[in-house]
Amino acid sequence: MAILKDTIIRYANARYATASGTSTATAASVSAASCPNLPLLLQKRRAIASAKSKNPNLVKRELQAHHSAISEYNNDQLDHYFRLSHTERPLYNLTNFNSQPQVNPKMRFLIFDFIMYCHTRLNLSTSTLFLTFTILDKYSSRFIIKSYNYQLLSLTALWISSKFWDSKNRMATLKVLQNLCCNQYSIKQFTTMEMHLFKSLDWSICQSATFDSYIDIFLFQSTSPLSPGVVLSAPLEAFIQQKLALLNNAAGTAINKSSSSQGPSLNINEIKLGAIMLCELASFNLELSFKYDRSLIALGAINLIKLSLNYYNSNLWENINLALEENCQDLDIKLSEISNTLLDIAMDQNSFPSSFKSKYLNSNKTSLAKSLLDALQNYCIQLKLEEFYRSQELETMYNTIFAQSFDSDSLTCVYSNATTPKSATVSSAATDYFSDHTHLRRLTKDSISPPFAFTPTSSSSSPSPFNSPYKTSSSMTTPDSASHHSHSGSFSSTQNSFKRSLSIPQNSSIFWPSPLTPTTPSLMSNRKLLQNLSVRSKRLFPVRPMATAHPCSAPTQLKKRSTSSVDCDFNDSSNLKKTR
């Protein structure tokens, strides 16, 4: 009986052990099957997303859904950007930056160029680049920067910005940052500088409205304007909303709308790319970065790109200066200054940062960025041409101004004798008036109004066929120009009456361009001639041409340089020796 009982217990234990082993193996297999292959799933998810992004209809529907979803909150978002701008505006101080003992504007340009290289190489977002520039400008306005820590500071700012804006797979790692600086800084130095930046900027380092944020919201507002019930009390916000309301109707064009009888449509992606390019160039400019609000710079870039594309693609011309001079407000003046500065920066491609050239001006000859820069250059040339033609309006106002300025008393003063000839006209009176050099003593510098433009003289008193249709002009002439006109019977006019003291620019160069001919517009496309129109010098009267030596005279012997240690004549090539 005991043997039977022992056999039953052993059999039961064996069955229990078999069952427990089977259940354990089953649980292990189930757990192994339940754990997914994360790298494989990530690869599949990216492949699906890449395939969907190539479907234009799906992308268009997604953009429409996004547009309708955020239309309810766009006003709140814009108001949030303005509040951030007002909060961080006092943090930018150009005087403090210029007071840096070891950092100057050239070093800032080089550091920004280096950061843009790193940003392009890592393929980071546009917001990351602008936030990095913002962090560097904020810190340099409040704290002294050592020259040997400037690169560490810039790379740390790029690291923080990438962690804030970019996805985790694109975020710059510490190993990558060390490779970018050739292992000049350790990982501990990067982490220490990161903590120092957060503490120095009160832990609100990323709360900034960047250029691309303003560009996105402005373009969105131009296609979906504010409702009539929204009222903005601040002058800057009201001014920007007014310009955004006019932006979509300027020059008879619309943004992202079908072409109509009023004019063609513009691609919003081209405007965004061009505005971002101008804002990137503006970030390298010290005056624009510290002096003007970022919202105004973004608005000026959008407006400038839109007008340039209108003229480049559809030949629709609109003068940006005339459009802004109509209101004569402070914000209009600032916007005009920003637009002209951006045009000057876009014209000088030789001064572009090397990182900007490698990013946009690559070997591809048909890139969109190059066409946008060509549009800006054509617009700038046409703008300077129109300003040049506007200066020709002085010739049509000669007789009117002199007839109002020289009355009978002035004529009696000029012709003091009793036998004043009847043929004495206003032109002769003006000639004698300018020939009297005592009037030059009353010249004041207060009434000088730049820009100063000189007009070419005409061989006859009839108006030129190339006169501008404009009715006003702010240009002035000099006594030399008046005496020159006395031989041809036509005189230039001034802004004020000649009964007042004359206002002659003291710091301007007298430049007489060639007479207007049908080939003048093609000749004026030369950049050097356009630059010479605005060149100023300290001489009041034109410099006499240098007298050439007589052909029979002996050649002039050149003296050796003061820094030269070789006792030889530079005209004699036999005395020259090779030096290291």
From Swiss-Prot:
GO terms for molecular function: cyclin-dependent protein serine/threonine kinase regulator activity. CDD domains: CYCLIN_ScCLN_like. Residues 454-469 have a biased composition (Low complexity). GO terms for cellular component: cyclin-dependent protein kinase holoenzyme complex; cytoplasm; nucleus. Keywords: Cell cycle, Cell division, Cyclin. Residues 454-498, 546-580 are annotated as: Disordered. InterPro entries: Cyclin (IPR039361), Cyclin-like_dom (IPR013763), Cyclin-like_sf (IPR036915), Cyclin_N (IPR006671), Cyclins_cyclin-box (IPR048258). Gene3D superfamilies: Cyclin-like. Residues 470-480, 563-580 have a biased composition (Polar residues). One of its GO terms (biological process) is vacuole fusion, non-autophagic. It holds the Pfam family Cyclin_N. The keyword Cell division applies. The keyword Cell division applies. Induction: Not significantly cell cycle regulated. It comes from the Eukaryota. PANTHER family: CYCLINS. Belongs to the cyclin family. Essential for the control of the cell cycle at the G1/S (start) transition. CLN3 may be an upstream activator of the G1 cyclins which directly catalyze start. This is G1/S-specific cyclin CLN3. It comes from Saccharomyces cerevisiae (strain ATCC 204508 / S288c) (Baker's yeast).
